[in-house]
């Protein structure tokens, strides 16, 4: 139908129902402002609304009394047009045309952070499909980084029109801390979470975004990367069990302190470069803190061989070691599990202690699966070690602390047959196998092993009494 109009263009009139209780009122100024700001802040055309505001009455229009004071109101209500959208889509600009201050302002706008970004990734992808990408690597980790309900930082736009935030389909879970925008003009607007997961364009975008992030991280200067890693290293580690395609590349980004590095971090590549000629495996140990790991009896034989050991103190490291059995053809080997195979046990010593070891095993059968001559110990008297595929002591501790049931598994008690105390225990055993003090020695050997790994004793009072009794006898 043809109509007469003063101006060219399309006019759309919406007729709204009266809002029911609890519904949004789309005639309210605040609601309209919020919708425009969220969905259309960056469209290239101005969105104008006629709003009511207050302005001061001009001086020559104010009525004053004899005392010179104004009579009546000094402000009046006026209607005026106001542009609601900023139209500043900095991701659509050329990289060189965006200033550092503009980046800082936009980063704070989308992230709600007060700090400046650590790195900026601003790129236009061209080819069969085109899309603009602007991503920021934060400087500080959010307090809720590992909460399941935490929102992802990526927003999805189509031709500058907001589609969705918290867009988990654009980046894998472990990179959810990255803040930014993807504007894909060719995106199907009939979009939903389910459709996005299957969308070929979105999968392609995701793949390229991950590549870009890795390239930036790999190109960082060491000092800057360490600052970033101390904030987000645990997030990168979380990608090892979940991102099979990028596992090797993620592993190259990991950093660990070692038995030789002091306060410095070491990469897996640097570790391999520093390996001894006769060393075949990458050794690691997990635990609560560096101090306890550095002094762990489990490392004595490795230190004696001058082998370096990775010290893993983040809970997520337990999943890293399970999901990363090897790196660049070098097997990762736990210092507390399986046979370290560093040296052979003296057969003569083994036979010499076999009766005592069988006795100890019988006394401790409710706590350990075996009692064996240790290949790990050089100075300490005892330690606990698991099978090759057993759960580590730290992993069991993590599960218990989180309220989960840890599998009931027994480990082997390893004893140092070259320790002078073991020689005395053997002497007592050979003199009288029924001597009640042997039971005390059994309990002490086990309790010492538990304490040395930071474990909790079942009966600390008995341990204290036994130690006190031994001290009294030795004085």
Which functions belong to the PLM regions below?
Residues 1-475:
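Conserved GHKL (Bergerat-fold) ATPase module
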């Amino acid at each position: 139908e043809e109509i007469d109009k003063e101006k060219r263009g399309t006019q759309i009139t919406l007729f709204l129902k009266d809002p029911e209780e609890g519904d949004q009122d789309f005639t309210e100024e605040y609601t309209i402002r919020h919708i425009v700001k969220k969905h259309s802040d960056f469209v290239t055309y101005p969105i104008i609304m006629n709003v009511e505001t207050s302005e001061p009455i001009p001086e020559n229009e104010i009525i004053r009394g004899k005392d010179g004071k104004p009579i009546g109101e000094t402000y009046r209500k006026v209607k005026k047009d106001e542009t609601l959208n900023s139209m500043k889509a900095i991701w659509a600009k050329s990289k060189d045309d965006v200033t550092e201050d503009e980046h800082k302002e936009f980063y704070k706008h989308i992230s709600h952070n007060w700090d400046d970004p650590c790195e900026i990734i601003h790129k236009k992808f061209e080819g069969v499909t085109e899309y603009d990408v602007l991503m920021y690597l934060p400087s500080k980790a959010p307090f809720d980084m590992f909460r399941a309900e935490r929102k992802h930082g990526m927003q999805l736009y189509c031709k500058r029109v907001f589609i969705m935030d918290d867009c988990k389909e654009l980046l894998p879970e472990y990179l959810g801390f990255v803040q930014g925008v993807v504007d894909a003009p060719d995106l199907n607007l009939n979009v939903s979470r389910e459709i996005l997961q299957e969308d070929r364009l979105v999968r392609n975008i995701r793949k390229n975004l991950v590549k870009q992030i890795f390239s930036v991280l790999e190109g960082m200067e060491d000092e800057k990367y360490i600052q970033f890693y101390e904030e987000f290293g645990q997030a990168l580690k979380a990608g090892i069990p979940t991102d099979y395609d990028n596992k090797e590349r993620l592993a190259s980004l990991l950093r660990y302190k070692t038995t030789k590095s002091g306060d410095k971090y070491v990469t897996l590549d640097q570790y391999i470069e520093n390996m001894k000629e006769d060393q075949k495996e990458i050794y690691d140990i997990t635990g609560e803190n560096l101090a306890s790991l550095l002094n762990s009896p489990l490392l004595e034989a490795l230190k004696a061989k001058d082998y370096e050991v990775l010290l893993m103190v983040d809970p997520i490291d337990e999943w890293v070691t399970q999901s990363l059995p090897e790196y660049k053809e070098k097997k990762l080997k736990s210092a507390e599990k399986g046979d370290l195979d560093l040296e052979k046990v003296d057969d003569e010593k083994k036979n010499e202690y076999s009766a005592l070891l069988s006795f100890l095993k019988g006394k401790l059968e409710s706590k350990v699966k075996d009692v064996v001559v240790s290949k790990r110990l050089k100075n300490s008297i005892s330690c606990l070690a698991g099978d090759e595929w057993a759960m580590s002591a730290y992993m069991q501790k993590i599960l218990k602390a989180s309220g989960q049931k840890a599998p009931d598994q027994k480990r082997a008690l390893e004893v140092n047959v070259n320790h002078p105390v073991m020689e005395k225990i053997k002497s007592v055993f050979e003199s009288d196998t029924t001597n009640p003090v042997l039971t005390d020695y059994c309990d002490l050997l086990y309790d010492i092993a538990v304490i040395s790994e930071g474990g909790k004793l079942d009966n600390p009072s008995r341990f204290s009494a036994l130690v006190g009794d031994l001290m009294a006898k030795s004085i």
